[in-house]
Amino acid sequence: MAFDLAARLAERRAADLYRQRPLLESPQGPEVVVDGQRLLAFCSNDYLGLANHPEVITAWQAGAERWGVGGGASHLVVGHSTPHHQVEEALAELTGRPRALLFSTGYMANLGAITALVGQGDTVLQDRLNHASLLDGGLLSGARFNRYLHNDPASLASRLDKAVGNTLVVTDGVFSMDGDLADLPALADVARARGAWLMVDDAHGLGTLGTQGGGIVEHFGLGVDDVPVLIGTLGKACGTAGAFVAGSEALIEALVQFARPYIYTTSQPPALACATLKSLELLRRETWRREHLAALIRQFREGAQQMGLQLMDSPTPIQPIVIGDSAQALRLSRLLRERGLLVTAIRPPTVPAGSARLRVTLSAAHSEAQVQLLLNALAECYPQLENADA
């Protein structure tokens, strides 16, 4: 029969790929309550520990008192409030660009930017490991769509030689499932030499990379000429919600006119923008957060490598432990949970077949002692997978 959803769901269960939503019963933080169980969490993207920061909460409360709780309309009607505008100005300053444009989600920002910039007769080239929202944007744009080998400037160059029309090269800044950095200097050189624009989604780099937290573009010392289109999200290191596109005056004005996900949606609550303004202030001022996070990353990598765990080449808070088999990844996640630790198993189709993993994420809110607890639990649990295979 048509729409045999039960069969599709059963097939996913049989392949150990069925997803379920854990119920969070506490605020974000290193220690959470999930499905009634108190756990030490290593799976949140709250990289700087700002999601439950008292000053950010107070800013939201004050914003609700001053501006109410609803955006009321789209930005182009009567939904563009003063706090929205102030956030855009703060983001432009943080990223060193003339303008920034606020979107309600990262998915919308990626779809909006790509579909506004390229269409039929144009070309969009993407890293094969890009986030789903980037791939969807490329497919929806109607442009000729192709993917180059992961983080491979030579592969990109060969595809650029066959490009037609306006050409947009799209890459994650930090790859969300591997934690590695895009080779932006090389990609920018290749794109510029062939007259293409480079678009970078820095969802996981903003706040964690760069001296001021400006992200991967600041990390590599690049500018708007190297990366004309910069995307960032506010629900990860910033600890609030939303996203933005930053670039030239002409780029932002073009998105206001042509980016459908921006035009045809109600603006985010202005009180949320008030909270984001405070989180951006803390992100820049409290540099100790990035310094402490970097120390935790070193601690985890050194400890995991001593155990012989298979890590990715990641200098970021994303530290995947590659298992391979989906059932085994789920088993390791369950073993850790039995010991009071929450580490999510990531399986296909989110990652390529045969590369299921535990995606460990670290936060500036974690302590060295908590990271050591994770390492101790891994040392106890990981060998049980090998014993099961024996």
Curated annotation (Swiss-Prot):
Enzyme Commission (EC) number: 2.3.1.47
Key words of the record: Biotin biosynthesis, Pyridoxal phosphate, Transferase
GO biological process, one term: biotin biosynthetic process
Broad class of enzyme this protein falls into: transferase
Pfam families assigned: Aminotran_1_2
Binding site residues for substrate: R19, H131, T350
GO terms, molecular function: 8-amino-7-oxononanoate synthase activity; pyridoxal phosphate binding
Subunit structure: Homodimer.
PANTHER family according to UniProt: 8-AMINO-7-OXONONANOATE SYNTHASE, CLASS II AMINOTRANSFERASE/8-AMINO-7-OXONONANOATE SYNTHASE
Protein name per its UniProtKB record: 8-amino-7-oxononanoate synthase
Organism: Pseudomonas putida (strain ATCC 700007 / DSM 6899 / JCM 31910 / BCRC 17059 / LMG 24140 / F1)
Gene name of this polypeptide: bioF
